[in-house]
Amino acid sequence: MYEIKNSKQVELSDRVRFRCVRCAACCRNVEGAVVIEPKDGYYLAKHLGISVSTFYEKYTRMFLLEDVEFPIFTLKVTGKDKACIFLNGKRCSVQDAKPRTCKMYPFWVCPDDKGGFLYNFSTEQRHHPKGSIVKVKDWMRDNLSEEDKEFFGEETRAMSEIAPLYNILHKCLKDNTTLIEKIIFFKYFLYETDEPFMSQFKRNNRVLKDELERIINKYTDIYGG
């Protein structure tokens, strides 16, 4: 999950100064910065009226994390200023479905190891006007939905099972192309936008785990464990 550089941890009870003047500066020079999580891809595809796989193919770039080669997607950028592909002048053309990274800015949130959340405030941009005081808890209430929280919980739970299996296969297989394709298909692509997201996300995680276990068992049968 994307973490904003140059940030400081804050508590829900804290207050910070921030005011958005819709200058769109935070939408420029964002190459590789706006990570698209499965939930983001689903809602953006639904908003645009296209399939989820078409959204990823048309509007994102895939990167493989160093060492483990786990696939992640980020929004494409355009122009010399490497602006978000959805920036139209100074306005977001997908405002109602914009990614969580954008919705939460200048904050970012991640799960802690106790089932709660860590909250951070970006200090990286000097163009932020020193506006009125913002209560952290109010910002989270308005921008961090219950489905976001449920997604965090399921993602953390699922990856605790999937990551060890993926790491085993990544080390054993000579060619990881098929492995990476399975991650992309089940984790990112396999959604119907006329069905609820979370039930599909949970199903896909279960199926992906079973599929990785099947490959491990097949590999063990062939080469020995």
Feature-to-residue mapping (PLM):
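Short loop/turn segments that flank or connect secondary-structure elements
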Residues: M1-G225
